[in-house]
Amino acid sequence: MKAAFARYRLDFINPAGTSRGVLYKKDTYFLKICDEQCPERFGIGECALFKGLSAEDNDGYEDKLRELCHNISQGVDTDLSAHSSILFGLESAILDFSNGCRRVCYDNGFATGDYHIPINGLVWMGTKDEMIARIDEKVNAGFGVIKLKIGAIDFEQELAMIRHLRTRYTDKDLTIRLDANGGFTPDNVGERLKRLSEYAIHSIEQPIKPGQWEAMAKVCEESPIPVALDEELIGITNPMMMMSLLRSIRPHYIVLKPSLMGGFSGSTDWLKMAAQFNIGGWITSALESNVGLNALAQWVAMLQPRIPQGLGTGALYSNNIDSPLEQKEDYLWSNPEKMWHLPEFEWINVD
């Protein structure tokens, strides 16, 4: 077997605002594996490094990719316990190769176009008027569940926006999920959650910054809004630590991003452990291109989700990879009449 990797820069169509700043571009990597005797047929996976959020965001990232590619050619295993995004890319590439190099990681109803995955509509941070306009656009497109990024602008403005939203859409018309990205503090989180709870909020992700287990446990116990852990899970791959976190904090939900949380294998472990505590959850993308989103969606389809997932990010980029993926109202599906068109990547081969 032989492996190579390539860099690729994704450009946002519109700046994406979060509590950590505004995103204009995102660098990602692709990994391919092939048989040396037939290099034109290869499995591909996306190593979706998330700068500023991934635990593996450091200067040694490409060195790890080189090590992996070299080890694959030598038939040697590579320790990827601290590199979730590379593990996600490797798992995807191996699965794709095993399924005939057809961009199929899991050969199920989603891959054939027969199964559609329910998704929420993501609304990025902006001014009150900008966010209301984006929400209206999502509702008009058919979304029944909206996820709002909050925590970047003045809280009173955000509250006014949600209040205004509820005057137009009841909780029967529209389900609202919130994602604070750790934007609140232990001192103000209780009062803010109480005020937000007046507007029939489904859940709020990561209300305070990760790493404050005792404070987060208190939030989960006292919050009038169900709390979901997101960033709290990043970088934790030891099974004992995973179990300890869930037992200590007892969130209502976990939100899994396989690129950041141990790939498919690690995320499966999180789901199994969460089930032991009756903790629910859903899956979201980590701003992957269509290559990563496709692999992720095929995996999610195996779970047969009953609630909307966070997989609606394929339309964010002006230079995304042409693929069969399409959004149809509030569903993601794979159109069997469309083909993959990979760009001419500049593959970096490692001996």
Short names for language-model regions:
Residues 69-76, 252, 277-283, 305-307:
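A short pocket-lining beta-strand/turn micro-motif at the edge of beta-sheets
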Residues 47, 206, 311:
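Active-site donor-binding loop signature of nucleotide-sugar glycosyltransferases
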Residues 1-176, 181-183, 197, 322-351:
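N-terminal capping/lid subdomain adjacent to the active-site entrance of alpha/beta enzymes
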Residues 286-351:
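C-terminal alpha-helical cap/extension of soluble enzyme domains
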Residues 96-100, 275, 298-301:
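Short glycine/serine- and small hydrophobic-enriched flexible loop segments
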Residues 121, 255, 310-311:
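Structural signal for conserved beta-strand scaffold positions within catalytic alpha/beta enzyme cores
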Residues 9-11, 125, 233, 287, ...:
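Short, solvent-exposed coil/turn elements at secondary-structure transition points
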